[in-house]
Amino acid sequence: GIGQPSETLKNYASTLEEARADLVGLYYLMDTKLIDLGLITTLDVGKASYDGYIRNGMLTQLIRIDLGKKIQEEHMQNRQLVASWAIEKGSPENVIEKIVREGKVYYEINDYEKLRALFGDLLREIQRIKSEGDYQAGKELVETYGVNVDLDSHTQVLERTKPLDKAPYGGFVNPVFIPLLNDNGDITDIIIENNQSFVEQMMYYAKNYSTLD
């Protein structure tokens, strides 16, 4: 039998799993079934997500890396892998166009449906790699598309974002759901509170959930 991905794909397993997970979401974001289910009202939601994903994978996330360094973190490797692979494979039909305007690099998606098909192709290949434990193919995919950083783009990102004084990482503060119970102990309503700072929430999680397995 085939071993677990952590055994067969070794140090590339996490990056490939992150890519697989992202690709599932990206593929279905452009599915009209989401409109049928009432989850979105227009496929512009998917298009905006595609724009953001390519921009982040190729440019924005580079603010987190020192100039000249390679990408080592799995989530970041995954995002560049997906974006750069799609750009290369879609280049014959100009699916994603690299534009230099006034000396600044931009990426413009010219065909969202074809990009969706490319995401599906990559998802199929990564699923095959994981299912078959194809270490060599997984290694080549990650090392070719997810590790090395274009020096010119990296330099430009750091220069363009420096005046913004923007933190390289962002955090989330989640709402706290407080159930209201009747005399029988049944939940009758939920009160949503969102009055914690990020630090307060981390301390709250540590106090209340640190013993969970």
Task: Identify the meaning behind each predicted range.
Residues G1-A19:
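Post-HEXXH active-site segment of zinc metalloproteases
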Residues S14-D31:
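An active-site-proximal "capping" alpha-helix that borders the catalytic cofactor pocket
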Residues L26-I129:
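Long, well-structured alpha-helical subdomains associated
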Residues G3-S6, T41, Q156:
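Short, well-ordered helical secondary-structure segments
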Residues E97-D213:
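Non-catalytic terminal regions of proteins
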